[in-house]
Amino acid sequence: IAKIEPRIASFDVADETVKVHLSDILINEEDYCEAARVLGTINLDTGARNVAPEKKASMYIKIAELYLQADDTVTAETFIKKASPLVHALQDLQQKMRFQVSFGRILDAKRMFLEAARRFYTISTEVGSLIENDDLLQLINKAIVCAILAKAGPQRSRMLGALFKDARTHQSKHFRVLESMYKQRILRRQDIATFDKSLMPHQQALLADGSTVLEKAVTEHNMLACAKLYNNITFKE
């Protein structure tokens, strides 16, 4: 066994090289699911090779991103979970950001909107000065969308407040809806028409009661806004 172990390691390296090249071809053909599947068959846990944790994490993140590109969030989550205990080994800030963004996208897809909003916003504050303005605005937009879609309550109100008070959000196309939500103004259908068109398919899916996530969020918001409005109305004797 000791004699053939070096050969096994060399075969694994060759296998990885071929599969990475094949995945690149599949990515160019926009076959993201198959590209991810091919990379997922690379043996990174063999005892014959000493694969660095940083390399493993990087590969798992790439596979997760490809599955997300193919709208397979379930399999993407499997690889993000594999990467999670290895993220501490990453030295490249860009790699860490890619992990966090992928994690946020999975939370978003699972309709864990408040958690997703927090993650996207945290990333924007941690790496905001190190990335392009367009990428930063994209992160902020994701945080705003998820915060607006989140279930009404004190935690959501705090998230909306943090976003509204952040001057960077004023550049967002969603700022007017954010402002109305934060200031507890009643939202009308025309106020959210443009916002609704910007949502991803999973964010527009129907709930058990036949409403969409946005419709439910707006209804909850308007009920709270109405309650506040009536509490502020007084009558002269």
Question: Where are the regions a protein language model picked out?
Answer:
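Extended alpha-helical scaffold regions
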Residues: I1-E237
